[in-house]
Design a protein with these regions (language model features):
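A detector for small-residue-rich transmembrane helices and their helix-helix packing motifs
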Residues: 1-264, 268, 272
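Terminal membrane-proximal soluble interaction domains of membrane-associated proteins
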Residues: 263-298
Length: 298
């Protein structure tokens, strides 16, 4: 019963939460589920890493053709506790700031758009540059970093001079924070986490592209939100209950009842009229007078 209450509370918090809170919930839920599954398999000396690769984004184009859904699923997967912790902290801080200037639907759209653009740039780089080619066949990417960087970049483009307080460095303008993050990714593009840094750049470009296009009246996330709305409506579909109850097969019985009732009423009126002729109006009872009056109105 206690567990049921906890699950109910979590569902209610998710339902009432802002979009960035909902995205954090989804990421954390996926992380817990995949981690618990991995632990269970390890207890029996089994590895499930190969299964999870089908949810991660491969650098190999041939492998990607076999698992195209990974362009969406990879942005909800994480490699460890610190990986998801920092991504979710950034999503929490900048998700709230993003909503000061854009809508909730824009945020979920930019999250997906940033992840897609980051993933595509990662695949392109690994298949174009000779430096990455030896790693292409066995490289996989996962994490929400590109999606989060898209949110940071879009907010930075919209409000470049917004003051951000940093614990050790004091207050700096948002545009400088974004430039530091992007600059770091450029410097470490050939590091051991090359795919992640490339994806960050793709996400950041997507965020700037979105904000710049929106300022000119074009919403790059509209198609994403249409797809998501359709998906949500399918998941939440409930057949509409009929407003009226319809009964079949009883028509003859109902006609018979109706006709019998009409005949009884007619016989009663005939009896009252006969009494009226013989003994006059005053001889009728109150009930008979009422029946006669009702019949005259039909």
């Amino acid at each position: 019963e206690e567990m049921t209450t906890i699950i109910t509370d979590l569902k209610e918090t998710f339902r009432r939460g802002n979009i960035y809170i909902q995205l954090i919930y989804i990421n954390v839920a996926v992380f817990i589920l995949t981690t618990l599954t991995e632990v269970m398999f390890q207890l029996f000396n089994r590895s499930i890493a190969g299964v999870f690769e089908w949810l991660e984004l491969p650098a190999s184009v041939i492998r990607f053709i076999l698992q195209p859904w990974s362009l969406l699923t990879y942005m909800f997967m994480h490699a460890g506790f610190m990986h998801i912790l920092f991504n979710m902290l950034w999503l929490y801080w900048f998700g709230a700031l993003f909503l000061s200037f854009f809508s909730a639907k824009h945020l979920r759209g930019v999250y997906i758009l940033g992840g897609i653009c980051g993933g595509l740039l990662y695949m392109a780089a690994y298949n174009i540059f000779p430096y990455f080619r030896p790693m292409t066949d066995y490289s996989f990417m996962l994490g929400a970093s590109a999606s989060v960087l898209a949110i940071v970049a879009a907010t930075s483009y919209r409000e470049p001079n917004y003051p951000i307080r940093l614990l050790l460095f004091g207050t700096i303008r948002l545009k400088y924070l974004a430039l530091i993050v992007i600059g770091t990714d450029l410097l470490f593009i050939t590091s051991s986490n090359a795919g992640g840094h490339i994806a960050h750049l793709g996400g950041a470009l997507a965020g700037v592209w979105f904000a710049a296009s929106l300022s000119k009246g074009s919403d790059l996330t509209s198609w994403i939100n249409k797809c998501l709305d359709t998906l949500v409506s399918i998941v939440n579909f409930k057949p509409r209950k009929p407003k009226m109850k319809v009964h079949y097969g009883t028509g003859k019985q109902k006609d018979y009842d109706y006709n019998a009732r009409k005949k009884a009423q007619s016989d009663e009126i005939d009896r009252i009229l006969d009494k009226l002729k013989k003994s006059g109006y005053e001889s009728l009872t109150t009930e008979e007078k009422k029946s006669l009056f009702d019949a005259s109105k039909r």
